[in-house]
Swiss-Prot record:
The lineage of its organism: Eukaryota, Metazoa, Spiralia, Lophotrochozoa, Mollusca. This is Conotoxin SIVA. InterPro entries: Conotoxin_a-typ. Belongs to the conotoxin A superfamily. It comes from the Eukaryota. Negative results: does not show activity on Kv1 channels from several sources expressed in Xenopus oocytes (Drosophila Shaker B c6-46, Xenopus XKv1.1 and XKv1.3, and Loligo SqKv1.1). Transmembrane segments: none annotated. Neurotoxin with probable activity on sodium channel. Induces intense repetitive firing of the frog neuromuscular junction, leading to a tetanic contracture in muscle fiber (spastic paralysis). In vivo, shows the same effect as the whole venom when injected on fish. Intraperitoneal injection into fish induces a period of rapid swimming followed by a spastic paralysis with stiff fibrillating fins. At high doses, the peptide is lethal to both fish and mice. It comes from Conus striatus.
Length: 69
């Protein structure tokens, strides 16, 4: 088998594995929809409740006692 033939076989194998391993948009949208819905509910709780989680955050102490005004 010559070098050109081996290179052609290599390219065909790479192309075949790329086509097989790439998911279609239709199949991946159903799985990602549940993750995106769950993320929306998690983000505000992380942003609004900073007291007690990390002492290095830039949260003013009055937010912990709800006395900011």
């Amino acid at each position: 088998m010559g070098m050109r033939m081996m290179f052609t076989v290599f390219l065909l194998v790479v192309l075949a594995t790329t086509v097989v391993s790439t998911p279609s948009d239709r199949a991946s949208d159903g799985r990602n929809a549940a993750v995106h819905e769950r993320q929306k509910s998690l983000v505000p709780s992380v942003i609004t409740t900073c007291c007690g989680y990390d002492p290095g955050t830039m949260c003013p102490p009055c937010r912990c006692t709800n006395s900011c005004g």
